[in-house]
């Protein structure tokens, strides 16, 4: 067997084993599989975003180099469709082939700063697929808390270690219109990917709750109202100013709020929501605390 095929198999079995041991928390802002998408990720972080989304016949571009051949073998074993091409070799044909697959309904994944860098600089040409087909682009960052980083590599390539805690963050979709400037859109993608990568690499693991919530792409805050509804509403408005991307759940228990008479109807919900500046939250009401939990919050507060 060719040495590159051997290396490809070794890499596949290592990644497959590691994947089976990871404890993964996904932060998916839009539902990544709800509609066809182009996934954008950094070259140095590619292992986790790709292997966590395997088995879906996603199209991914690999370079024409020896490393690209190894990568293509790994991707095929994970049920990806590997298209060979790079910025210097067979680029146009590879893009045309990728667009052809996209027209058939396949999802697409690009390492948008690959294959040679510079690091974390998006190549605008790769956005053509999203623009030509009219499908959304979703930035992705997935990081294992324990990983091996090749610091001398141009992309600071990361290899996740087995049994690691892992976070996968799927950002808000970016739409690239037919008349949009690709260079400007490349900067937008670059900015969003850097934010997600910074959060996944650093702030997700922070023990400082303010730091965590400030950098979370869409934190979920759960507030349990024990006594004063107006105080809870004021607190939500205060937190909304501090963490503008937050989504809130306000839980009102009729067991603990014996002094509050709240009929279970739409008018009460409307009355509460009208006092809030933003209506991006849930209001839960009832006797069962567990039954009324609709989200897994990042932060809980009792007032």
Residue ranges and their predicted role:
Residues 1-13, 17, 54, 96-217:
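Non-catalytic C-terminal accessory region of glycerolipid acyltransferases
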Residues 5-26, 62-100, 258-267:
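Membrane-interfacial amphipathic helices and adjacent loop/beta segments
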Residues 14-36, 43-48:
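A short, well-structured juxtamembrane/interface segment
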Residues 36-89, 133, 148-149:
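Catalytic core of membrane glycerolipid acyltransferases/transacylases, capturing the structured
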Residues 59-64, 248-254:
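Short internal beta-strands
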Residues 223-234:
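A short, glycine/small-residue-rich beta-strand->loop->alpha-helix junction that serves as a flexible
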């Amino acid at each position: 067997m060719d040495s590159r095929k051997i290396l490809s198999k070794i890499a596949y079995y290592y990644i497959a084993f590691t994947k089976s041991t990871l404890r993964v928390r996904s932060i998916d802002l839009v539902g990544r599989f709800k509609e066809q998408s182009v996934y954008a990720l950094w070259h140095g972080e590619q292992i986790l975003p790709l292997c966590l989304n395997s088995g879906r016949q996603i199209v991914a571009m690999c370079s024409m180099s020896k490393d690209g051949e190894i990568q293509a073998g790994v991707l095929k074993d994970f049920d990806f469709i590997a298209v060979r091409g790079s910025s210097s070799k067979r680029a146009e044909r590879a893009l045309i082939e990728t667009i052809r697959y996209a027209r058939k309904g396949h999802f697409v994944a690009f390492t948008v700063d690959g294959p040679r860098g510079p690091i974390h600089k998006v190549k605008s040409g790769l956005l053509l697929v999203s623009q030509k087909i009219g499908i959304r682009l979703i930035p992705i960052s997935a990081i294992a808390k324990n990983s091996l980083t090749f610091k001398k590599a141009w992309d600071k390539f990361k290899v996740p270690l087995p049994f690691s805690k892992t976070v996968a963050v799927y950002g808000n979709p970016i739409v690239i219109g037919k008349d949009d400037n690709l260079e400007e859109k490349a900067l937008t993608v670059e900015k969003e990917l850097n934010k997600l990568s910074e959060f996944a690499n650093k702030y997700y693991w922070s023990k400082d709750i303010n730091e965590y919530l400030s950098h979370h792409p869409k934190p979920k805050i759960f507030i349990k109202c024990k006594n004063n509804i107006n105080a809870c509403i004021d607190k939500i408005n205060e937190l909304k100013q501090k963490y503008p991307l937050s989504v809130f759940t306000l839980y009102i228990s009729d067991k603990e709020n014996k002094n509050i008479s709240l009929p279970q109807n739409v008018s009460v919900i409307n009355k509460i929501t009208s006092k809030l500046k933003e209506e991006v939250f849930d209001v839960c009401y009832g006797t069962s605390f567990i039954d009324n939990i609709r989200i897994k919050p990042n932060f809980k507060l009792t007032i």
